[in-house]
Amino acid sequence: MILKLSKTKKMPCKSLSFPANKEVCKGMIDYVTKEMKDVCKGCYAKKGFYHMPNGKINRQDNYTLSKQDNFVETMIKEINNDLYFRWFDSGDIYSQEFLEKVLEVCKLTPTTNHWIPTKSRELFNQETWVLLEALPNVK
């Protein structure tokens, strides 16, 4: 299994893709109403080319690899010289442990500008988010 970063047409940089499901996109559910958030109802990662079999396999493999101990090192090798990197053209931060890995990657790639679109901001440790968002290379 090999980490495969995606390159979407509308973005000038590589991106990490995970499956867009409840296991990964924990922020898609409003925990008060138990309903899917409106912003997630039209998720582009659930239509179009995102349904192609190879893409689905790659996103699942990326998710599996993100749980391994060497994920941080793998990501650093993949993006270290890039000017920009977008986390998640599909998927999201799914656990505190993964959030900490994202923080490490961002710290160790200071010349890369990281964009981290997320719907999971309120679900994990706020101190970790503050550390991540304080980095000068994180948007």
Model-derived regions, located:
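Class I S-adenosyl-L-methionine
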Residues: 1-139
